[in-house]
């Protein structure tokens, strides 16, 4: 099983943000913190698979993540708005948060 390399306390903060802002959304992590080739300064790459709510904005979600106490950079995008080739790469290895 693929693992997300994030401390439990940081994962809890992220899950709390997602639960409060977009409880119906599915959030995927991918990249070095999933593949295992990360270091302490690595960012966390994430995508929103689907907001399931037209009133939610990726910009607002980014701001909530940036305002959190998580001590590393995070990047989040909408999966459906990424190029097909990038979606294919993400689908090879990801973790649902």
Residues covered by each model-derived region:
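Catalytic core of pol beta-like nucleotidyltransferases
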Residues: 1-26, 34-40, 49-97
């Amino acid at each position: 099983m693929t693992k997300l390399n994030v401390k439990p306390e940081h994962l809890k903060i992220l899950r709390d943000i997602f639960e409060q802002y977009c409880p119906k959304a599915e959030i995927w992590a991918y990249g070095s913190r999933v593949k295992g080739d990360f270091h302490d300064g690595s960012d966390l790459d994430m995508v929103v698979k689907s907001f399931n709510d037209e009133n939610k904005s990726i910009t607002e979600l980014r701001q909530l993540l940036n305002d959190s106490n998580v001590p590393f950079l995070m990047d989040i995008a909408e999966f459906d708005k990424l190029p097909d080739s990038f979606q294919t790469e993400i689908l090879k290895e990801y973790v649902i948060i």
